[in-house]
Amino acid sequence: MDNNPNINECIPYNCLSNPEVEVLGGERIETGYTPIDISLSLTQFLLSEFVPGAGFVLGLVDIIWGIFGPSQWDAFLVQIEQLINQRIEEFARNQAISRLEGLSNLYQIYAESFREWEADPTNPALREEMRIQFNDMNSALTTAIPLLAVQNYQVPLLSVYVQAANLHLSVLRDVSVFGQRWGFDAATINSRYNDLTRLIGNYTDYAVRWYNTGLERVWGPDSRDWVRYNQFRRELTLTVLDIVALFSNYDSRRYPIRTVSQLTREIYTNPVLENFDGSFRGMAQRIEPEYRQPHLMDILNSISIYTDVHRGFNYWSGHQITTSPVGFSGPEFTFPLYGTYGNAAPPQRIAQTGLGIFRTLSSPLYRRIILGSGPNNQELFVLDGTEFSFASLTTNLPSTIYRQRGTVDSLDVIPPQDNSVPPRAGFSHRLSHVPMLSQAAGAVYTLRASLFLLLVLLIHARSIFNNIIPSSQITQSFKKIISWTSVVKGPGFTGGDILRRPSPGLISTLRVNITAPLSQRYRVRIRYAFTTNLQFLTSIDGRPINQGNFYATMSSGSNLQSGSFRTVGFTTPFNFSNGSSVFTLSAHVFNSGNEVYIDRIEFVPAEVTFEAEYDLERAQNGVNQLFTSSNQIGLKTDGTDYHIDQVSNLVECLSDEFCLDEKQELSEKVKHAKRLSDERNLLQDPNFRGINRQLDRGWRGSHDITIQGGDDVFKENYVTLLGTFDECYPTYLYQKIDQSKLKAYTSYQLRGYIEDSQDLEIYLIGYNAKQQTVNVPGTGSLWPVYAPKPIGKCGEPNRCAPHLEWNPDLDCSCRDGEKCAHHSLHFSIDIDVGCTDLNEDLGVWVIFKIKTEDGHARLGNLEFLEEKPLVGEALARVKRAEKKWRDKRVKLEWETNIVYKEAKESVDALFVNSQYDQLQADTNIAMIHAADKRVHSIREAYLPELSVIPGVNAAIFEELEGRIFTAFSLYDARNVIKNGDFNNGLSCWNVKGHVDVEEQNNQRSVLVVPEWEAEVSQEVRVCPGRGYFPRVTAYKEGYGEGCVTIHEIENNTDELKFSNCVEEEIYPNNTVTCNDYTVNQEEYGGAYTSRNRGYNEAPSVPADYASVYEEKSYTDGRRENPCEFNRGYRDYTGLPVGYVTKALEYFPETDKVWIEIGETEGTFIVDSVELLLMEE
């Protein structure tokens, strides 16, 4: 040190205000095993040991999950709390630490079980234990990770979130690789693999999003703000982004062997020099541009340092850097001068030695220089010297010292990644660049001379300088940019910057060094994102090797996310002709102005099966499994139409770039399979082109059924059946398989796929009725409940996105009449067909029905196909059932002849002639109902399972029922009173006072007049000169009389009076008295009541069926239909005792009469009022 009497004091650097050691609330992160140490160790482990197995599992235990306690997890939280100046509330902190502790305990059990299983992989008990441990671990992680994303604390919890996400992905990779050996079925393994690929994207995007949010939060205008901003960027790159950049390697089907990944991003240390108060005002905007712009990786060759002097003090005044490109040979590049040239001493050149500079020890110096008396002082803040240490895995290399060694150690902020070896071998980063910003500030009284802001820029130690391509691993290589190709900042999850090209042309070249024999063959894969379809061309040493079409992955203007990138390769393998070769990549056949991004180029040994090949192999196996032989002549019987659709989806989703020819060939085969499936399907219109389109063929159904186009579950049309509010009006769908299409003594099967259903009843009806009730509570969807269903760019279902696979173990087959188990996606029912007599035309009815309010169903891919000929016991059984059915038919015909004769006589008696166009004069409503009841005693007119389907006696029933309808119509035509039975309440009636219409227990609506001042009336138009029969059925309670009066404006009044009968009263014009009515009621079976002739097409059917060939005699009782009235008949109960029917003759003199109802005392109850026109 110079002896200068004007030097007042010297302040050591470690006494200066340093934002690095500022703490929140007095807390301080302890040195040693810090979150950065742990994250660096984990990243080094992931880069070097990324191979599934017990070694990887136990490695995670050793690094984190087996040694961490609450204090270590709390250190992760404190780290970000300090950086963003936000404390996590106690509840969120305790919840996070508790969850992490639980995961740690559970993973240690998982790891020990894994170790034991790997030592004895065929042991059934250990395989079962691994299944249990995996399910427990996966469930715990699925539950815990969302709790590490607490609202308002996403940033401070981010590093522990990433640690848990990394653990989850590793566990899912384990089951994807080893699940089959543990005993999981293929569908479960595929489902967990789909979870893995989905969560790689979800966890990546979440981490990058909240990293950027935190980074924006710590930005400020001054130099001290920038220091904290840079610290957040550096430390969360190490604890978050570096780990996230390796998430994609967990895709076990894309990276099935060891993969060499490289982190090419750069991070900055804290400024080696900064002014003593740490707050250059407004300097952040000047400092940030000094952060090196996006670039491809290069190698630091040398630093030439210049020395200047001020007031007798020598210091680092400037420097120049030279670098060499990585991945190709080229001239050394010299960067412009940082700072200023100095001539106080010769320039000192720090040359690259060994594995590069891994450590710097800098000596900053602050001096306050007193210039005489007064305030005119100077402050000098300079770098007095630096020692540069060189990395080596074997020996200690001598360091190079510029002037002198200092105390500011770069390892304090970026420590080694392996503390088990000396830092020269366990280093985590190498020096790649040294930017510098200098400033001299002046004032009237104060001079700050030559103040410097100097940063050390480092790149990860795993970055390899020479693009070595071995034979046993997947290598991700670096690139050289070409004119019109630029380097842009990576989106945060790529581990470095990426290439961008807006127009066609050459994108990149790289030199690769081959350590394997030149006979080794490779395939190229590219991780890319772009806004347009294009064509990639590749070549080696000028020799073209690949050409393929690639498709857009994102829309113009959208942000780069993990889902924007795809990794796709070429199908044609190649080999290198030289040990050092130049690989080139170019893009063509797209319009300028689009965005083309390249993240990395991968070289994969040709023997490795990766995702596109796996997809092709799976599609090929799926197509081949559809057929009975290699010549594709016939389909396998167990291959469903739904499964053919799913196989076609596999084919359609194959990569055009990778296997276009194979895709076209497989497409033709699967189309052939679909045509064969259609040919063997005996159902008409299985694709639901329409319902009720044709009367004599195809599907018939209720009007509330909807046909919908394909979705993520169904490739073709499917139907949706909704619930009903009345079981007598069910939702139904049916079709008949004609007898002519069936083979004698053959078994047939109905099958299909149900996306979800409740209370869906399925019937097959031939010689016997087969029923199945299926409930599938939404498990048919191919997407997890918590995951949104992916869609294409035009809103169509994206069937190529990861989803659940078809699982044959979920099939449900119901035989011999039993009900189907719940939660079945595939259903099937078998039915045996006997002799196919075309004269009988029995056929087979296929029925789907829902009769409950909560019922619903979505189903498709329906098939009815021949299964096998009946032989042996099955043949004998169906012949026995056939004989019983014929015996029943003979007996039914004999019974029907008798019942038909009686019913026809009752119907004929209603009319005056065989033309059935005029009723007998004395025909009343009771007689019509009585005849209707006898018509409905004809059995097997309609199927009891669904009353809209005609049975064997449908023709004669319809014949007589039509005449009953005619009788009702003729009766209505001659009864001129509207709503005389009060079935529609008080409609058409005028009311004064208080009256009610009540429905009584016998299902009759009656008018109740409870007060003497009340009156009900109706004006009726009549034909003057014609005769009418006023007829009233009523009941009087209590004292007094009930009166029904018919009158005109002037005189001509008649009335019917009702009282509580004590003695018989005879009215001159009455046709019925109190005593007479009982006889009349008995004659017609008590059928006289209000009627409902609505046509209901859907009865309810009990779900309990006898076994298939159980005897059921027609004479022992029919299968009753509780909705019998749906064809116009209702088994009305008789009138209660006390009701009286009275009538008289009336001849109006005008065209209007009034009917008035009233009473004098008590209550008057009126069942019906009629005014019947006399026949001429």
From Swiss-Prot:
This protein's record includes keyword Transmembrane helix: no
GO BP, sorted A to Z: sporulation resulting in formation of a cellular spore; symbiont-mediated killing of host cell
Alphabetical keyword list: Plasmid, Sporulation, Toxin, Virulence
Disulfide bonds: none
Taxonomic superkingdom: Bacteria
Note: Toxic segment of the protein is located in the N-terminus.
Similarity-based family: Belongs to the delta endotoxin family.
Alphabetical list of InterPro entries matching this protein: Cry1Ac-like_dom-VII (IPR048645), Cry_V (IPR041587), Galactose-bd-like_sf (IPR008979), Pest_crys (IPR038979), Pest_crys_dom-III (IPR005638), Pest_crys_dom_I (IPR005639), Pest_crys_N_sf (IPR036716), Pest_cryst_cen_dom_sf (IPR036399)
Keyword NAD: no
Protein name, as recorded: Pesticidal crystal protein Cry1Ag
PANTHER family xref list: ENDOTOXIN_N DOMAIN-CONTAINING PROTEIN-RELATED (PTHR37003), PESTICIDAL CRYSTAL PROTEIN N-TERMINAL DOMAIN-CONTAINING PROTEIN (PTHR37003:SF2)
Species, as recorded: Bacillus thuringiensis
Cited function: Promotes colloidosmotic lysis by binding to the midgut epithelial cells of many lepidopteran larvae.
Pfam family for this entry, one: Endotoxin_C
Record-level Gene Ontology MF annotations: signaling receptor binding; toxin activity
